[in-house]
């Protein structure tokens, strides 16, 4: 908005308070940029190759089409698909969404080039395309206005592009000499400018759906009104009638409808203190929220929206903490590892911070973008048209040169990261050299949220260049989300790495984010971690997190501890301690573990191959509509007889000779079942097409006093550095393990104590160990030459004549 309009807005704010009563029409363009900003953008194009390249991208998309249109307008316009009678088509039936979005993207890109070049051939092309739609939609009402036939797709695609094009060519359309191509006459003719407004009002009306039910402020909603919000807001800002524009904006921002919920009172309150949208990993980015807040702040600066939602701008920087060593993201719920919205978030945040003078936020955004570009090997400037992404040109219009010599860094590799709404705790231990190969990173947790899976406390592990132990994830297409493979397996317990109680673990339908999904579960909570969320560790070798689930659906308690333990720059392992008990009858517990690979080898701790026989024990379900717990999809199931001995399972990846070594200590009677499961989504090197290896471990009774304990060592070698894993016991209670590793010819012994209370006590007089607390480690290197004592949470740790006290804190670390 121009300066004069802003001044008028300030005066009117003073006169009328917070009820907006602007009396002056918008000056266009207004949505992304103003006329006052044009020269700054042209200066960028003149000075920087990346900006020049993106202007060229706009030309590359539309120039040939504009030339063809000048010669014969009907060539392009005649190929525009028919517009359906209303917006009742399903997402699968709206097959023309891509075609309509493409032609309106051409119109908007041409309009942007008109803004940049003042060349009216671009404006004429854009106007003619828009008029084609106006001639059809001007006779309709909001209820039957559509372009592709689907009410959810229209605002995300064609409506947004239509409004952007209109905004950029607004002044051209209002020239008395402007004409548009009318197909019926096969020539350029004068036109009724009011019809553009009629169509824009129809588009906004069909998106808001004021004719439907009202909004219920504060309710739990999906991401749909966020994804449609930019397209709706763009249309509102194009309405000329000041009073109607402000009324519609009030509906969008304050009042809301059941279809397009109030941005202020329903959408924004769902952002918690962490400032991220509460869904699965890739759905949480939601850059449209920062985009909308930024545009509102540009147009209505008097609202001071940037002051009220700083938690969201802070939350934009959380996601880079969720990358695995290969740069892809951890995956919980319906999520895709390769989907990355961080750069969009940083660009929008930077634009806002620069305009508002938030120097710290501006500096942080520049640093984050600089690190992103370094990770890519340099800034890859490119505008790429996409059906569901109208914001690509903002890379140019909101582009900012990022200095190459930024020395500051944001540490996105802290050992502990918590995602509270998803019940997730991340643990990592990275190395300076070849981190993609030797870095460790895993997550544990679970919860109900939109796009959640029902998993209890699930786990995901990275190692040796792969996500070795994957969660269920999301299929490639929307259609595949609705087939039994996703709904009855990947989204359920057995499609993830968790513990199933009595063969019946399941979710329920009441409260579920999706009809017929049966995925509601309680939220897993973090009860301990060292270091705390995004804090520095006390040791470069050890860290841990413990998650707890009070499962009221399955009437059980579960607690899971994940620790990453480093033994050298090239070796390290995960410790997984899973406690589980039914609060009624403990028949049996099943520890389910998936690993990508070509084969699974089961041996005893002495190297004896375990014999297995076919079994049908996992061809069952509880009889609910989704066949919980989901393990009917296990194939080629073969089980051992129950054994007390320790077990070493090796999962082999033939492609480049990588391995996951899994050690389960002796002492508890268990049977082990190998199986093949559906292929892992987004797996590397062809494993997306190969069956996933599964190991299911069944233990009769409870698994709290005798928890499932497993040590996982990813490796590039067929032989592991971990030599033995034996249990630490307190009478009949298993409280931890002794892990002996051999690294570069030197023995490293780790005594790892994992209790179920911060006030737990363990004493082993034979080993001369005494510990008070929840989690502690004693490391002995060589023949007692170096002793390391680590208290992750606790008061005192003693070993032989060595003592470590946490004193006023709950953590401590010392090397003797």
From Swiss-Prot:
Its EC number is 4.2.2.-. Keywords: Lyase, Periplasm, Signal. Induction: By ulvan and rhamnose. Its main location: other. It is an enzyme of class 4 (lyase). GO terms for molecular function: lyase activity. It is found in: Cell surface; Periplasm. Belongs to the polysaccharide lyase family. This is Endo-acting ulvan lyase. It comes from Formosa agariphila (strain DSM 15362 / KCTC 12365 / LMG 23005 / KMM 3901 / M-2Alg 35-1).
């Amino acid at each position: 908005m121009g300066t004069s309009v802003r001044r008028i807005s300030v005066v009117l704010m003073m006169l009328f308070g917070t009820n907006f009563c602007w009396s002056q029409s918008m000056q266009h363009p207004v949505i992304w940029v103003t006329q006052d900003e044009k020269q700054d953008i042209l200066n960028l194009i003149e000075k920087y190759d990346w900006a020049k390249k993106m202007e060229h991208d706009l030309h590359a998309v539309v120039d040939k089409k504009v030339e063809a249109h000048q010669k014969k307008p009907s060539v392009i316009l005649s190929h525009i698909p028919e517009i359906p009678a209303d917006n009742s088509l399903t997402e699968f039936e709206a097959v023309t969404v891509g075609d309509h979005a493409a032609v309106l993207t051409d119109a908007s890109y041409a309009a942007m080039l008109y803004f940049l070049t003042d060349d009216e051939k671009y404006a004429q092309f854009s106007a003619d395309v828009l008029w084609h739609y106006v001639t059809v939609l001007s006779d309709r009402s909001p209820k039957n206005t559509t372009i592709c036939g689907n009410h959810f797709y229209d605002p995300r695609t064609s409506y947004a592009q239509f409004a952007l094009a209109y905004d950029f060519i607004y002044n051209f359309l209002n020239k008395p000499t402007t004409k548009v191509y009318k197909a019926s006459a096969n020539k350029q003719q004068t036109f009724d400018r009011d019809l553009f407004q009629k169509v824009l009002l129809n588009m906004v009306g069909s998106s808001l759906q004021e004719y439907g039910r009202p909004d219920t402020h504060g309710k739990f909603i999906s991401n749909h009104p966020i994804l449609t919000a930019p397209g709706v807001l763009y249309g509102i800002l194009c309405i000329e009638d000041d009073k109607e524009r402000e009324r519609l904006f009030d509906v969008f921002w304050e009042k809301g409808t059941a279809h397009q919920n109030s941005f202020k009172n329903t959408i924004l309150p769902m952002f918690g203190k962490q400032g991220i949208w509460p869904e699965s990993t890739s759905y949480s980015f939601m850059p449209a929220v920062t985009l909308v807040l930024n545009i509102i702040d540009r147009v209505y600066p008097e609202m001071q929206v940037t002051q009220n939602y700083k938690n969201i701008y802070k939350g934009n920087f959380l996601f880079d903490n969720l990358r695995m060593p290969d740069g892809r993201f951890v995956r919980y719920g319906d999520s895709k590892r390769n989907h990355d919205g961080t750069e969009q978030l940083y660009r929008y945040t930077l634009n806002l911070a620069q305009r508002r003078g938030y120097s710290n936020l501006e500096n942080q955004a520049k640093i984050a973008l600089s690190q992103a570009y370094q990770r890519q090997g340099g800034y890859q400037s490119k505008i790429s048209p996409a059906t569901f992404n109208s914001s690509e040109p903002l890379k140019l219009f909101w582009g900012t040169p990022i200095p190459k010599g930024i020395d500051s860094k944001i540490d996105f590799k802290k050992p502990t990261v918590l995602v509270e709404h998803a019940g997730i705790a991340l643990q990592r231990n990275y190395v300076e050299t070849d981190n993609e190969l030797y870095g460790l990173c895993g997550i544990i947790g679970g919860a109900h949220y939109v796009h959640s899976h029902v998993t209890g406390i699930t786990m995901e592990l990275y190692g040796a260049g792969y996500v070795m132990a994957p969660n269920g994830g999301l299929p490639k297409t929307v259609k595949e989300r609705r087939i039994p493979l996703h709904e009855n397996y990947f989204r359920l317990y057995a499609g993830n790495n968790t513990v199933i109680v009595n063969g019946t673990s399941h979710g329920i339908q009441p409260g579920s984010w999706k009809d017929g999904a049966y995925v509601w579960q309680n939220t897993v909570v973090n009860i301990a971690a060292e270091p705390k969320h995004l804090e520095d560790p006390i040791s470069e070798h050890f860290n841990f997190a413990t998650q707890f689930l009070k499962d009221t659906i399955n009437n059980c308690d579960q607690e899971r501890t994940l620790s990453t333990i480093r033994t050298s720059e090239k070796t390290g392992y995960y410790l997984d301690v899973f406690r589980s008990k039914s609060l009624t009858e403990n028949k049996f517990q099943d520890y389910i573990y998936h690993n990508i690979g070509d084969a699974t080898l089961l041996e005893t701790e002495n190297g004896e191959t375990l014999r297995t026989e076919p079994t049908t024990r996992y061809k069952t379900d509880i009889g609910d509509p989704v066949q919980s717990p989901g393990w009917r999809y296990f194939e080629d199931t073969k089980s051992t007889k129950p054994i007390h001995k320790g077990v070493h399972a090796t999962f082999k990846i033939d492609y480049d000779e990588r391995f996951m070594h899994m050690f389960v200590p002796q002492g508890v009677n268990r049977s082990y079942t190998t199986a093949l499961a559906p292929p892992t989504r987004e797996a590397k090197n062809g494993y997306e097409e190969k069956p996933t290896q599964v190991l299911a471990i069944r233990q009769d009774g409870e698994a709290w006093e005798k928890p499932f304990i497993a040590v996982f060592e990813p490796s590039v070698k067929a032989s592991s550095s971990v030599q033995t894993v034996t249990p630490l016991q307190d009478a009949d209670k298993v409280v931890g393990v002794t892990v002996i590793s051999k690294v570069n010819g030197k023995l490293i012994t780790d005594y790892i104590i994992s209790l179920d209370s911060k006030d737990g006590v363990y004493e082993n007089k034979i080993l001369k160990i005494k510990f008070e607390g929840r989690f502690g480690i004693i490391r002995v290197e060589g023949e007692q030459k170096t002793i390391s004592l680590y208290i992750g949470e606790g008061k005192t740790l003693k070993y032989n004549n060595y003592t470590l006290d946490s004193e006023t804190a709950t953590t401590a670390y010392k090397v003797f």
